[in-house]
């Protein structure tokens, strides 16, 4: 973390907009990063509750222990763009060191993309919150982002944005297209194959991947789709190449098909 990625050095370079700085920025941000990596559930567990003293890894917090309010105050003032740049530089180092060439699938670097909800509340909100009606018809505020990741590394995330008036908030596909274009611009050819669930079987999204020189594997589960019906018909006629194998108690069949009989030009043109 220190010698290769230089994370501690970069944290020390973050802008500190606090007027009073009784505790150095590094002495707050670095422990927060470590505790997030260790998946502690609450800042209170670390910085407030007396019983948490024994839970703190030795030498993780040095000097004066910050109160949880001081932690929140500092984190709310840090520019997210600076954090994003540290993350992007870390991805650059991983690419340069050819880390992503380990654990490929047939030599292809595969990355998944999906939406994730980060926060929800009926009481607290900010200008960037999305909104919806919950089961009791109360307005619920939440944050949601699209995340692109390899099995162990997050390439990037894109927050979905609220819209004014009666328009619906941004959808996952809109954020996904923006994320793909951003990663392509920032990191070049960051992956070979993008894997996604059935939501992403969408012409504009697939076209975005094609424009960025990416292949895709998308789950197809709607039996009503013509593409599904066409593929099933070809399976029954033993078209294409077939491979069978077992995984635990499950028997899995993999088919490699091309030359579908329906006109797909409207789908991926």
Enumerate the language-model features and the residues they cover:
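Gly/serine-rich nucleotide phosphate-binding loop at the start of the catalytic core
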Residues: 1-66, 72
């Amino acid at each position: 973390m220190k010698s290769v990625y230089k994370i501690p050095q970069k944290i020390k370079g973050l802008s500190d907009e606090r007027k009073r700085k009784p505790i150095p920025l590094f002495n707050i941000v670095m422990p927060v990063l470590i505790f997030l990596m260790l998946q502690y559930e609450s800042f209170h567990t670390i910085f407030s509750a007396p019983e948490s003293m024994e839970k703190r890894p030795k030498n993780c917090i040095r000097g004066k222990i910050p109160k949880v309010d001081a932690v929140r105050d500092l984190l709310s003032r840090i520019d997210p763009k600076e954090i994003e740049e540290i993350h992007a530089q870390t991805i650059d180092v991983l690419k340069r060191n050819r880390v992503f060439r380990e654990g490929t699938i047939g030599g292809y670097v595969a990355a998944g993309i999906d939406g994730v909800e980060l926060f929800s509340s009926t009481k607290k909100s900010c200008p960037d919150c999305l909104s919806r009606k919950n089961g009791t018809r109360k307005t619920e505020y939440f944050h949601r982002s699209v995340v692109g990741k390899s099995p162990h590394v997050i390439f990037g995330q894109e927050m979905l944005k609220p819209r004014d008036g009666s328009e619906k908030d941004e959808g996952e596909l809109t954020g996904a297209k923006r994320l793909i274009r951003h990663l392509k611009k920032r990191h070049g050819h960051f992956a070979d194959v993008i894997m996604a669930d059935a939501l992403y079987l969408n012409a504009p999204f697939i076209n975005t991947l094609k424009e960025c020189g990416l292949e895709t594997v998308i789950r197809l589960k709607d039996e009503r789709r013509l593409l599904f019906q066409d593929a099933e018909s070809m399976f029954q006629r033993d078209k294409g190449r077939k491979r069978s194998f077992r995984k635990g108690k499950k028997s899995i069949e993999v088919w490699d098909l091309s030359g579908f009989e329906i006109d797909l030009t409207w789908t991926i043109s």
